[in-house]
Amino acid sequence: KGCSFVEAVETLMGKAAVMPTVTVKPKQKTEPKILLLPDKSASTDKITEYLFGRGIDYTIIQYCIDKGLVFESLPYHNLVCVGFDEKNTPRYASFRATNDRRVLGDCSGSDKHYSFRIADSDSSTVHLFECAIDLLSYATLMKLEGKDWRQFNLVSLAGVYSPKQKIEDSKVPVTLGRLLEKDKTIRRIVLHLDNDIAGRKATKALQTILSDKYEVVDDPPQY
């Protein structure tokens, strides 16, 4: 009498005032990813031929090889594009076949906070691309126009950016987020994302979530 339905049931079942013990597991510290790079070939002939066949300027190819930004892997002679942290330690790498097969992906342990980029300048403008090949193609176009491509801040997003269904709730890609956090001089962001549905959706999302702090320019590839 005078008790609630739930209390009555608990009393009848012999569970009144008996609460199960709840064990709270401590949060495990996230260990830094360990990047597993493939073996490196002594030759760069296959990747040079592949990139040159994709229209990339030879000087830019050689620059990337000399800087360790790209290398040819063993045993499959894939093109590997590498991203480094502030200590010049490889933290990200993608691979793609240099033959007709569509084999591509990220190397195990890749951290997209440190994706492939060419950034030898203190420019307040950052140029964003979906992948390393798009970035290198743009650098080639700048060279053809007589501009010093090394003075551009060129960053790959390491894949197609997928915004939230409700665009306003989208998050900044981790690559760009880290860059904006580290470099407070950036004022302008130029988006060179593809003209397909995914690229247009990603562009709209980035314009929506970034335009309050930065000048955001849409400049898709003209091909």
Name the predicted role of every residue range.
Residues 51, 81, 88, 130, ...:
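Terminal peptide-recognition signature
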Residues 142-223:
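TOPRIM fold recognition
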Residues 128-133, 158-162:
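Conserved mixed alpha/beta catalytic, RNA-binding, or beta-rich assembly cores of soluble enzyme
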Residues 102-124:
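Glycine-/acidic-rich phosphate or pyrophosphate-binding loops and their flanking alpha/beta elements
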Residues 1-50:
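Non-catalytic accessory segments of DNA primases and related replication-initiation nucleases
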Residues 1, 135-144:
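Short active-site loop/helix that positions an aromatic residue
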Residues 122-126, 188-189:
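Short active-site oxyanion
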Residues 53, 59-80:
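Active-site-proximal, Lys/Arg-enriched surface segment
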